[in-house]
Amino acid sequence: MPHRYFTTEIADGTATLRGADAHHLARVMRGKLGDTVILCDGNAVEYTAVITGFGPETVEFSVEPGYPSAAEPSVEVTLFAGYPKQDKLEQVIRHGVELGCAHFVPFFSRYCVAAPKKEEQKNERYNRIAFEAAKQCGRGILPDVALPLPNFGAVCRSLEGYDLVLFCYECGGAPLRELLANVRPADGKKPKIAVITGAEGGFAAEEAEMAAQAGAKTVGLGPRKKM
């Protein structure tokens, strides 16, 4: 299977790869003239590309016409994730990318154990993790990670424009399958779904009420079953 790389420098049948990925292809993978790779523009369009040249910090390609990436889900998912303790947000982002999330919005809430600290520096690292995960699992877009929201009220004020908002509540709710049954594309656009998950401490009752007032649908995964 050809290696995959992201680049926005694709036009008129040619493309350029720069930076760490160019170094990886040229030095680590020892790419040669005529080798074929897959390039993705980060907007779910992929290109079959043939290496035509190497510069000091670039790799040049000729590319065939683009085609839609088959790796993207039929919905656009934003994950609002309660900020977990230690480095667990890295795992949330990595696995969320693998599962098809397009956007990540961490937030602090009543029962979060973690506290804000050097969030701008962390955000750079989180976006790098999302980028690497997208490359590794063959995504057609570059998922992004926002700076964390300071409280749950800020989350609720961010929920306009979604076709469906799912509030994952430990006290139960409607079956997920039922809530997703009527989600359909409209006017050729992907449905936009927001999923809200809590940190280790879950949600306060008043936060659940705020979510409902903001239009969120409370969802549960059903009762635990004994093995």
Question: Where are the regions a protein language model picked out?
Answer:
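N-terminal positively charged helical leader segments and presequences
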Residues: 1-68
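Structural motif
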Residues: 4, 36-37, 59, 76-78, ...
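RNA substrate-binding interface of SAM-dependent RNA methyltransferases
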Residues: 70-167
